[in-house]
Amino acid sequence: MESEGWPALQPLLCFAWIAATLPIIAAALPIPTAVGGHLLRRLLSAFSSRGKTVRPSPASSSGSSSSKAKFTVPQKYFMHFYVVGVLATTILLLAIWFYAYMKLTPLLLESSSYSTIFSHLVGSNSFSFGRVRSRTMGHKYRVWRTVFALLLMEVQVLRRLYETEHVFHYSPARMHIVGYLTGLFYYVAAPLSLASSCIPEAAEYFQGQVPEFVVKGRARMPDLVIDSSSLLQPLLKLGWTQWIGAVIFIWGSLHQIRCHAILGSLREHKDYDEYVIPCGDCFNRVSCPHYLAELVIYFGMLVASGAEDIPVWFLFIFVITNLSFAAVETYNWYLQKFEDYPRSRYAIIPFVC
């Protein structure tokens, strides 16, 4: 079911993710310098740089440093990503949850044995009836799966917003404006991708409610009564795939919390632009275990969503490529900055890169 104006949402999201991912993949490929490979890698490194990897070199002239500053923003603007993410995710979560509650409740399982007996008694037409009921049930599950996935996304952005304010102590370093805009795009497109299959029908539902409210008026509209148990019961009746995804998500989140606590403890003085080698937890194996945990988190979301919508796959592919590229850049920076940096560490994924 698709509302007018929304049928192109999924293709647009796929195109946006592909457009954001391809330059990263191209920069990672061994493209010869003669055809612009080195330039592409330098440009992408500059655009994606932040914090320690974007600071002007001490040998740079004052004019060069001033020019770089024009295209950068303070690294503490990371908070903007999560504010936007919370707003976008909350709006989508509340809208689709309300739509699912009003139109797709209760969520009940059909008895296969009852359907079989009924088909023998009534005849072959019952098979068509069963298929219709099956499609209806599948549609209900798809919408409630979306609510579940958006709940996980909401937990993620709320936690990251909290960590940005209370865990991380950002230095005076800066990040490139292109990376900043990419972050804003990401935290709008990610919840849209998770909800893309349900947005058209939810939008159609709300579009139908507005004229009804205008015609009838508030006094003649039925009172809205929300049963809290009906809000949660459909989520508890979802399949085992959703709960496996939730367990993966929770494991990745707990691991990332530990990694962020380690990183936050390295900079007790906010005004000092100084970096040290992080140690402990998986930092002893990889340079960016917090990025690895993020991959696990979004893999959990992918599993919990049912992994049926193409935009969610492109979202996950972007997360893999973007964080892998950033991890390699960070790893190379550590090697250049610290002579005693452990070269046995991988960038992000043990035994892979």
UniProtKB/Swiss-Prot annotation:
Keywords: Cell membrane, Membrane, NADP, Oxidoreductase, Transmembrane, Transmembrane helix
InterPro entries: 3-oxo-5_a-steroid_4-DH_C, Dfg10/SRD5A3
Subcellular location: Cell membrane
TM annotation in the entry: 11-31, 78-98, 175-195, 234-254, 291-308, 313-335
Enzyme Commission (EC) number: 1.3.1.94
Any single Gene Ontology cellular-component annotation: plasma membrane
Enzyme class: oxidoreductase
Protein task: Plays a key role in early steps of protein N-linked glycosylation by being involved in the conversion of polyprenol into dolichol. Acts as a polyprenal reductase that mediates the reduction of polyprenal into dolichal in a NADP-dependent mechanism. Dolichols are required for the synthesis of dolichol-linked monosaccharides and the oligosaccharide precursor used for N-glycosylation.
Family: Belongs to the steroid 5-alpha reductase family. Polyprenal reductase subfamily.
Protein name from the UniProt record: Polyprenal reductase 2
Species of provenance: Oryza sativa subsp. japonica (Rice)
Source species taxonomy: Eukaryota, Viridiplantae, Streptophyta, Embryophyta, Tracheophyta
